[in-house]
Amino acid sequence: MESSMNNAFIMSKHETAMFTDDQNPEESSWTMYFEDFFEASSSIVDVGDFSSSSVSDAASFVATKKTLNVSKQEGSNLDIKRTRNREIPFGRHHDLEDTASSPSGSPNVYSMMNLQDNNTRHGGGIVGDDEKRVSAVPNQGGLPIDLKKKGLCLVPLSMVTNFLG
C-alpha cells in the first residue's frame, strides 16, 4: 500500500516536471485569457501587480480590481428609481409558485388531489365518463373551463411540433 502511494507521488513529481515555464499544473486556459485581457487594457485600468497564482478565477480578481476613473459628480447624476413591488393575488399566478421544493403543499396540487379523491370515491375515475358528469362541468370547445384557466389543456403533438418547428 505504501509503495503504491510512493509510486503515485513520484509519478506526480514526474508529471509536474513535464510542464513548461509558462504553464503551471493549476493554471487553466482562462488564466492566460485574463492575463492577455488585462495586459491589453492596462492603460485604462490600474490593476496593480498580479501573477497567475493571484488570479485563480474571475471572481477573486473582481474584488481587487480598481474601478475606472469615474468622478463622484457623474455618480450623483444617476437616476435610479426603485420599482414598486406589485402584490400578486394568491392563487392567480400559478406559474410563479415555488413547486420545486414542496409540490404537495402547492394549492394546485392539493386541489387536484382532492378532485381525484372525490372522483374515485364517487365511482368515477375520469371526469366526463358519463353524460351527466359532462353536463355538470361547463364546457367550451369540449374542455372544462377551469382546466383551461390552469393551463392544463390537451394539445395534439403535431400542433406542438408545428409551433416549435
Swiss-Prot record:
Q: What other comment is given for this protein?
A: Plants overexpressing VUP4 exhibit severe dwarfism.
Task: Report what the protein is called.
Answer: Vascular-related unknown protein 4
- Role according to the record: Involved in the regulation of plant growth.
- PANTHER family named among the record's database cross-references: VASCULAR-RELATED UNKNOWN PROTEIN 1-RELATED (PTHR33974), VASCULAR-RELATED UNKNOWN PROTEIN 4 (PTHR33974:SF26)
Q: Name one GO biological process term.
A: xylem development
Highest taxon, organism lineage? Eukaryota
